[in-house]
């Protein structure tokens, strides 16, 4: 049985970040900085409450007679209580013989063009551990992008304004960055398991390292750019945030309304139409929060019964990173032209160059991951390098055709076909392991 390392990581980040936020808020109170104290507590306690409710919702404890679990969650100690449950189940799993098991079927990665279907017995203890891992992973994503991301931005902004960094602030910024990167990593794993739910997915350690570096560079540079821009144009940053937020929040709904599909009713049997609407709104809220700081890897599709698109859209990925790079460049240029005296001893051109190179480095690690370390790269219809070469050929062909004054309608169609690749395997449907796969509702069960 797999050791629950992801549970330990989630609980450690949750407890450490909450404790650091409480300590830092007390120092702000002692210094008389009431506003910083309130915001620090808000970005700590709000995701903390959402995490408690997420764990309760996933395990359906609200409809069960478990007063101790409810009490621990009310005391904001739910993750610690759940962690103890996980280790009790893990330690007792080898001692007790499983009276009941379920059988799941998965396909192995193709070897020499052949893919075998294997059966696996899953006992009750292992099924409970899978549920706990999924619950903590969902909670980590919520904590990362609804708590840690604004917390990191706030503390870095305070550091820039005061031109001073304390030990407590440095500690919480480090924890917040780790929490965001870990949440983004969980999003990547979620996307892989959803798109290839027929297959037995095994992520290698080098793949985790590559994703960690990709997300670290991407998120760190994004937060620094937002903080620099906020420090000189406080009013305009509201417009930037609102445009980013509502673009990603409304996009899934606009696509849904344009499709003319009926309202999804099969998300959760216990939910009414109002409850389903609330869950979908929270899902799109979390989706917008993720995409404001990094690529979500999971694409919402409300008109889909599973609420998540299983196709790998390279075209959308390309558009996202090109747009985000242009946006970061524009924000840095505006900061350069309107910077104040607090940046007197900062070499602005060098800082801008470092941030843009850092963001490009993150994109480079992303390409390396998809080219060499993706666990399902054998199922891709084309690799990253092949898609890039096809894009260059289409671009050159388009340029030549324009020079010859010929119609470009077919060229645009070919260009889109070269950049948008559907990598889903065309295999027969098998029985997926239900408890091991996240759905869109699983991601936002709060």
Swiss-Prot record:
GO terms for cellular component: endoplasmic reticulum membrane; plasma membrane. It is a multi-pass membrane protein. It is found in: Endoplasmic reticulum membrane. Residues 1-2, 59-68, 162-171, 230-235, 299-317, 371-446 are cytoplasmic. The chain crosses the membrane at residues 3-23, 38-58, 69-89, 141-161, 172-192, 209-229, 236-256, 278-298, 318-338, 350-370. InterPro entries: XK-rel (IPR018629), XK-related_adapter (IPR051773). The modification Phosphoserine is found at residue 115. GO terms for molecular function: protein-macromolecule adaptor activity. Keywords: Amino-acid transport, Disulfide bond, Endoplasmic reticulum, Membrane, Phosphoprotein, Transmembrane, Transmembrane helix, Transport. Its main location: endoplasmic reticulum. Heterodimer with Kell; disulfide-linked. Interacts with VPS13A. PANTHER family: ENDOPLASMIC RETICULUM MEMBRANE ADAPTER PROTEIN XK, MEMBRANE TRANSPORT PROTEIN XK FAMILY MEMBER. Belongs to the XK family. Recruits the lipid transfer protein VPS13A from lipid droplets to the endoplasmic reticulum (ER) membrane. This is Endoplasmic reticulum membrane adapter protein XK. It comes from Mus musculus (Mouse). The gene is Xk.
